[in-house]
From Swiss-Prot:
Subunit structure: Homodimer; each protomer has one site for sodium and one site for proton binding. Interacts with CHP1 and CHP2.
Entries under Pfam families matching the protein: Na_H_Exchanger (PF00999), NEXCaM_BD (PF16644)
Record PANTHER family: SODIUM/HYDROGEN EXCHANGER (PTHR10110), SODIUM_HYDROGEN EXCHANGER 4 (PTHR10110:SF103)
Family annotation (InterPro entries): Cation/H_exchanger_CPA1, Cation/H_exchanger_TM, NaH_exchanger, NHE-2/4, NHE_CaM-bd
Glycosylation sites: 342
Protein name: Sodium/hydrogen exchanger 4
Organism of origin: Rattus norvegicus (Rat)
Cytoplasmic side: 1-13, 29-69, 91-94, 149-154, 217-225, 291-304, 378-384, 472-717
Gene Ontology annotations of biological process type: gastric acid secretion; glandular epithelial cell development; potassium ion transmembrane transport; regulation of intracellular pH; sodium ion import across plasma membrane; transepithelial ammonium transport
Length: 717
């Protein structure tokens, strides 16, 4: 009972603190609305304080207007952080529901308090806050920590699904809702085709962050995880590009008609915006990697370079009306490959946790704003539009999933099963992106904006609460194929070997696939890019670098899980010995590294095998005599045992088929017959004597002189 009561008391403390913060936020909003003046500048504040000459110095003053904006921003961030802490206090709660559900509930609670105290809709974000401050950290974190190899191995299926799937969902939902709006009984006749298509583009933006958390816990197979991850990474960018193009069409349609040329220009702009954003991101990633080559002595600014250049890529792309989301994604992927090898380990840890912190805070604020906007007067309800929107989202999601994956499975070595496709269909959770795009619709172009916001909230609430909560049990019920354990160093080395081997086989056969593309890029990378972008481009063994990377990763994981704290601390005697050991100089370390590199690069020499074709001639007299003596002893022993000479076939013997079964009697009987035949034949002894005499004369000559001993080696071989 004691620990349970302590946990309950701690939970009640957190809940009470959350309530206090919500009341503070509500009171700050009331003060903001009741104050006739806005935020004062320091000069205006000084002028106001010095306007009355008879005013005395007061001991205590209250000036909320001066700190209003940073105070409220700090309160919002603190409220979001405490909400996440409270969510993870109960260890069972994250397994039952996604984190976004609790954040929406907390936001709805805050909105209810604000609306109840002042009877006015609570404050929400505008377009500049969302697109310039909240969205970039989320996209940067997703791109930087993306598993690169699985992503590019499935890049074809990801682009096929994320790109074409977003277009099918957007136009399918938009056209279906347009036909529903033509029914006069529903009272939706004032919503035209462009407005429905625009609503379809924003409602098709999925946000399966909660689903990815469930997949990581369930350890589903890698290709299923990468399809959902790739959709989450690219779908927002595609939806935002389509959203901006359709808004431009809506503005144009207000003043003039849209022609076929405008539609072709819109399609061309869709391609240029996407490709231009990727190009900008890669360029800024290369620039940041090149600058980090020279930061070995000032490593404190390395995290600043990473964040500033990634944010600059987003702003530069948005300045030229390109896709900032795709730009910052490409920049993050490029920096992940090159910048990590230049920055120190401390800078890498700082980048990792600061990036995750910014992404978590931004996403939490968006979900809380979503809950806040639920309560207020900015809603319009229409049963037909809301219900058909929810139905069409599910229908077109199913059509796009099963159609596109049926086509892609025809070209895949490992196709997606029906279970995988069902999980992908069920993972279409709408979230912060759809709500933000709906809330940022210009009211002058969309008179039914409140209806769009209401329908978006209903779809988001249904997918987040219902699908987000039930996706875990569904994965366990369907028994989706699980992933393998983490690759060991042996598996990693064999994967690299097989990639290189497959590229060579394809080159010999005249075929082409992604193995050759990867191999050519690796050669180009090692030959040019790494020499320019990497600080110390010295030839190192890939085994050494991979071992160092795995050891570093294992040490970080042990430090994060607390395993290093369980290791016994060294005794004072050991500490003295460690301190007494002389540290290696940089020259010694460099020489050791060179020795290891050379030895690991060298191929072990194979021992030569000798035969009669490569045997070197020997001129030693002792060796020739020894060979002759041993040969004579061998022949004498064979004759003493009653055996015939190996090169003489005794008379009357049969031709045996070797490497097959004999014709007749077993081995002992055959040996007896051969012995009887050979012992009674005097020609064998005479032939043996003459042969030995001829060999001696051939080697030593008729007068006993040594001739060419190498002839003996040839004869014996």
């Amino acid at each position: 009972m004691g620990p349970a009561m302590l946990r309950a008391f701690s939970s009640w403390k957190w809940l009470l603190l959350l309530m206090v913060l919500t009341c503070l936020e509500a009171s700050s909003y009331v003060n903001e609305s009741s104050s006739p003046t806005g935020q004062q500048t320091p000069d205006a504040r000084f002028a106001a304080s010095s306007s009355d000459p008879d005013e005395r110095i007061s001991v205590f003053e209250l000036d909320y207007d001066y700190v209003q904006i940073p105070y409220e921003v700090t309160l919002w961030i603190l409220l979001a952080s405490l909400a996440k802490i409270g969510f993870h206090l109960y260890h069972r709660l994250p397994h039952l529901m996604p984190e976004s559900c609790l954040l929406i509930i907390v936001g709805a609670l805050v909105g209810s308090i604000i609306f109840g105290t002042h009877h006015k809709s609570p404050p929400v974000m505008d377009s500049s806050i969302y697109f310039l401050y909240l969205l970039p950290p989320i996209v940067l974190e997703s791109g930087y920590f993306m598993p690169t190899r699985p992503f590019f191995e499935n890049i074809g299926s990801i682009l096929w699904w994320a790109g074409l799937g977003a277009l099918i969902n957007a136009f399918g939902i938009g056209l279906s809702l347009y036909f529903i709006c033509q029914i006069k009984a529903f009272g939706l006749g004032d919503i035209n085709l462009l407005q429905n298509l625009l609503f379809g583009s924003l409602i098709s933006a999925v946000d399966p962050v909660a689903v990815l958390a469930v997949f990581e816990e369930a350890r589903v197979n890698e290709q299923l995880y990468m399809m959902i991850f790739g959709e989450a990474l690219l779908n927002d960018g595609i939806s935002v590009v389509l959203y901006n193009i359709l808004i431009a069409f809506t503005k144009m349609h207000k003043f003039e008609d849209i022609e076929a040329v405008d539609i072709l220009a819109g399609c061309a702009r869709f391609v240029i915006v996407g490709c231009g954003g990727v190009f900008f991101g890669i360029i800024f990633g290369f620039i940041s990697a090149f600058i980090t080559r020279f930061t070995q002595n000032i490593s404190a600014i390395e995290p600043l370079i990473v964040f500033m250049f990634s944010y600059l890529s987003y702003l530069a792309a948005e300045t030229l009306y390109l896709s900032g989301i795709l730009a910052i994604t490409a920049c993050a992927v490029t920096m992940k490959k090159y910048v990590e090898e230049n920055v120190s380990q401390t800078s890498y840890t700082t980048i990792k946790y600061f990036m995750k912190m910014l992404s978590s805070v931004s996403e939490t604020l968006i979900f809380i704003f979503m809950g806040v906007s639920t309560v207020g007067k900015n809603h319009e309800w229409n049963w037909a539009f809301v219900c058909f929107t929810l139905a069409f989202c599910q229908i077109w999601r199913a059509i796009s999933v099963f159609t596109l994956f049926y086509v892609s499975n025809q070209f895949r070595t490992f196709p997606f099963s029906i279970k995988d496709q069902l999980i992908i269909f069920y993972s279409g959770v709408r979230g912060a992106g759809s709500f933000s795009l709906a809330f940022l619709l210009p009211l002058t172009l969309f008179p039914r904006k409140k209806l769009f916001v209401t329908a978006t909230l209903v779809v988001t609430y249904f997918t987040v609460f219902f699908q987000g909560i039930t996706i875990g049990p569904l994965v366990r019920y369907l028994d989706v194929r699980k992933t393998n354990k983490k690759e060991s160093i042996n598996e990693e080395l064999h994967i690299r070997l097989m990639d290189h081997l497959k590229a060579g086989i394809e080159d010999v056969c005249g075929q082409w696939s992604h193995y050759q593309v990867r191999d050519k890029f690796k050669k180009f990378d090692h030959r040019y890019l790494r020499k320019i972008l990497i600080r110390r481009n010295q030839p190192k063994s890939s085994i050494v670098s991979l071992y160092k990377k795995l050891e570093m990763k294992q040490a970080i994981e042990m430090a994060e899980t607390g395993l290093l704290s369980s290791v016994a601390s060294p005794t004072p005697y050991q500490s003295e010995r460690i301190q007494g050991i002389k540290r290696l100089s940089p020259e010694d370390v460099e020489s050791m590294r060179d020795i290891l590199t050379r030895n690991m690069y060298q191929v072990r020499q194979r021992t030569l095998s000798y035969n009669k074709y490569n045997l070197k001639p020997q001129t030693s007299e002792k060796q020739a005599k020894e060979i002759l003596i041993r040969r004579q002893n061998t022949l004498r022993e064979s004759l003493r045992k009653g055996q015939s000479l190996p090169w003489v076939k005794p008379a009357g013997t049969k031709n045996f088929r070797y490497l097959s079964f004999p014709y007749s009697n077993p081995q002992p009987a055959r040996r007896g017959a051969r012995a009887a035949e050979s012992t009674g034949n005097p020609c064998c002894w005479l032939l043996h004597f003459l042969l030995c005499r001829a060999m001696v004369e051939k080697i030593w000559g008729p007068g006993g002189q040594e001739t060419q001993p190498r002839l003996l080696c040839r004869n014996l071989n």
